[in-house]
From Swiss-Prot:
Positions bound to FAD: 92-120, 370-383
Pathway: Plant hormone biosynthesis; abscisate biosynthesis
Lineage: Eukaryota, Viridiplantae, Streptophyta, Embryophyta, Tracheophyta
Primary localisation category: plastid
Species of provenance: Spinacia oleracea
Catalyzed reactions per annotation: all-trans-zeaxanthin + 4 reduced [2Fe-2S]-[ferredoxin] + 2 O2 + 4 H(+) = all-trans-violaxanthin + 4 oxidized [2Fe-2S]-[ferredoxin] + 2 H2O
Name listed for the protein in its UniProt record: Zeaxanthin epoxidase, chloroplastic
Length: 675
């Protein structure tokens, strides 16, 4: 069961994660200047024609549309609700589970005047779920639903999160690191005036929600083990024997829901086929300003890494095997190196940067959504009825959407009962909520499973997984499935993201679409989507040649200059007359003036200067070739450059960004690390 913290111990963090990747204290969300400078209903974003057709909206800056104006407009429509004068509705709602879904629903119901009581099992959200699952991705659709529920709470969540939706995200080949398909999660949000996707510490999110719900609503150390529905009231029984009575019960007690079991009997969760290792590392990649998250694809395994702010990266490593596996003590990191041997530097480097103690493992389960979510005065929401695989990052988002829809449906039913003078029909209201959510949840649940199937069947080259024919892999022939998959995914992905992120926005009553200047993406975003070369040139780290091989210990790293008039000369002796840097390598196969490395427009080139034994490059797809003399050849991150053929001067190209020292000991960094 997901759970929350004891309310009395809550102190909501004021630390936010901005694109600087340093924790910065935020001003109060109620600060007038904060609103006027950061939230505007029309922004100066100009979005080119999208890949899925149709003209993207041109949104111009207009200072007349500050958030205060939006609030004033909503005051006209919903004066009582915005002013906080919500008439109390004589309907008592019991909620089993104080995880994200349970707390969001409790907040939504409380805001609409209902009497809510949340029963929470223990502190597993901090010690268990929060520890195992780390920061959570809250996507645009869920953030918009939060805004429709409580704008002040939503602003705290927005301020505490690290924006990832304003950068490149997508799928890459796990071995080469080359882009397979890029995701645009920015445009679908801005087109509909939705907040841009963020990641936030799970603990921080639950603290914000619990503080808003209130101490008087949450009862900790209270595990709902049974209930009775007599048609007029529902009574719940806790594991300590206490009973409570209400007008309806909402089961938000997670994938192992006791409410679900009591409703429909025992049913096994569905094993996804994957075990998952996860961790958080003090690590900042060189493309942190241009890439939010990546999914690295492989055959029967895949790896996900995401910026979570504060100089940290969160990662998940999925591996197809039977459930219940156990690693050797302190052996998880080594097993990851074994599983992902030969994969690209982006995967290996973040594993290297992760402490063994920070790595956790769990098997991944989901539940097939039921056509019937409840009976009588009892219903379910979130993982208790449609637990999803984490591949789309929509599990928690769907719970938030569920919460909004259920609170809205009950509110409308109450208003109808007041107008008609008849008692509220709770059972019919719950059925209406279930019907409104069933299709959307079912489709997204299916897409999450489909994403896992894609990862299972992905093969970069012909010969992978073919046993005796595996030698074909060395020929580097693109696998037909890889080619065909890209042909399908490229046009389908924008449509899918547009529906996932924006498909629920029209149901959010009273929410006024707006854009935030603080979420403005780079002017180069569109170019990065279209041009991998431009994305590489945007790297902000230091280009370095790192020695590798058996004699690496006798060589020193070579740090390359970005200045075009400062070349690096590689040779057997120092060249004092060089306008840049001179590196002397002691090897019989290194010519006196062997090669030259130059930078032009952010790209690096190596030129063999007519050396006897040549200069060689092995690229990220394993192709090895000798450079033609006196002809500049571009090289890329992860390429291997060899001067001569005796393996005594071999270097790997790395682009490294050092995480800020301030982030390592900051309170926010500590929160993320323990999450």
């Amino acid at each position: 069961m997901a759970s929350t913290v004891l309310y009395n111990s809550l102190t909501t963090s004021t630390t936010v994660f901005l694109r600087s990747h340093l924790p910065i204290s935020s001003s109060s969300p109620n600060d007038e200047l904060h609103h006027q400078s950061s939230v505007i209903s029309n922004c100066n974003y100009y979005l080119k024609k999208s890949s899925f057709g149709g003209q993207r909206k041109k949104l111009k800056e207009n200072n007349n549309y500050v958030k205060a104006a939006a609030v004033a407009e909503s005051l006209k429509t919903y004066p009582n609700e915005v002013a906080g004068d919500v008439p109390e509705k004589k309907l008592r709602i019991l909620v089993a589970g104080g995880g994200i879904g349970g707390l969001v629903f409790a907040l939504a119901a409380k805001k609409r005047g209902f009497d809510v009581k949340v029963f929470e099992k223990d502190l597993s959200a901090i010690r268990g779920e929060g520890k195992y699952r780390g920061p959570i991705q809250v996507q645009s659709n869920a953030l918009a639903a939060l805004e429709a529920i409580d704008m002040d709470v939503a602003e705290k969540v927005l301020a505490a999160g690290c924006v990832t939706g304003d950068r490149i995200n997508g799928l890459v080949d796990g071995v080469s690191g080359n882009w397979y398909v890029k995701f645009d999660t920015f445009t679908p949000a801005v087109e509909r005036g939705l907040p841009v996707t963020r990641v936030i510490s799970r603990m921080t999110l639950q603290q914000i929600l619990a503080e808003a719900v209130g101490e008087e609503v949450i009862t900790n150390e209270s595990n709902v083990v049974d209930f009775k529905d007599d048609g007029n009231k529902v009574s719940v029984t806790l594991d300590n024997g206490k009973t409570f009575e209400g007008d309806l019960l909402v089961g938000a007690d997670g994938i192992w829901s006791k409410v679900r079991t009591n409703l429909f009997g025992h049913s096994d969760a569905v094993y996804s086929g994957y075990t998952c290792y996860t961790g958080i590392a003090d690590y900042v990649p060189a493309d942190i300003d241009s890439v939010g998250y990546r999914v690295f694809l492989g055959n029967k395994q895949y790896f996900v890494s995401s910026d979570v702010g504060g100089g940290k990266m969160q990662w998940y490593a999925f591996y197809k095997e039977a459930p219940g596996g156990v690693d050797q003590p302190n052996g998880m990191k080594q097993r990851l190196f074994d599983i992902f041997e030969g994969w690209c530097d982006n995967v290996i480097d973040v594993i290297i940067a992760t402490d063994e103690e920070a790595i956790l493992r769990r098997d991944i389960y989901d539940r097939t959504p039921k056509l019937t979510w409840g009976q009588g005065r009892v219903t379910l929401l979130g993982d208790s009825v449609h637990a999803m695989q984490p591949n789309l990052g929509q599990g928690g988002c769907m719970a938030i959407e569920d919460s909004y829809e259920l609170a809205l449906t009950l509110d409308k039913a109450w208003q109808k009962s007041v107008e008609s003078g008849r008692p509220i029909d709770v059972a019919s209201s719950l059925k209406s909520y279930e019907g409104a959510r069933r299709l959307r949840v079912g489709v997204i649940h299916g897409l999450a499973r489909l994403a896992a199937v894609m990862a299972t069947t992905y093969k970069s080259y012909l010969g992978i997984g073919l046993g005796p024919l595996s030698f074909l892999t060395k020929l580097r022939i693109p696998h037909p499935g890889r080619v065909g998959g890209r042909f399908f995914i490229t046009p389908a992905m924008p449509l899918m993201l547009r529906w996932i992120l924006g498909g629920n926005s029209e149901k959010l009553e009273g929410r006024i679409p707006y854009c935030s200047l603080s979420e403005k993406a780079s002017n180069n975003l569109q170019r990065w989507f279209e041009d991998d070369d431009a994305l590489e040139r945007a790297l902000t780290g230091e280009w370095t040649l790192l020695p590798q091989g058996s004699v690496a210990g006798s060589l020193k790293p070579i740090c390359l200059s970005r200045k075009e008039d400062e070349p690096c000369i590689i040779g057997g002796v120092f060249h004092k007359d060089s306008s840049g840097m001179s590196v002397a390598l002691s090897s019989p196969q290194i010519s006196e003036k062997h090669a030259q490395i130059t930078c032009k427009n952010g790209a690096y080139f190596v030129t063999d200067l007519g050396s006897e034994h040549g200069t060689w490059i092995t690229d990220n797809e394993g192709r090895n070739y000798r450079l033609p003399p006196n002809f500049p050849t571009r090289f890329h991150p992860s390429d291997v450059i060899e001067f001569g053929t005796d393996k005594k001067a071999v270097y790997r190209v790395k682009v490294m960004a050092t995480p800020p020292k301030a982030s390592q000991n900051s309170p926010s960094a500590a929160v993320l690390q323990t999450a």
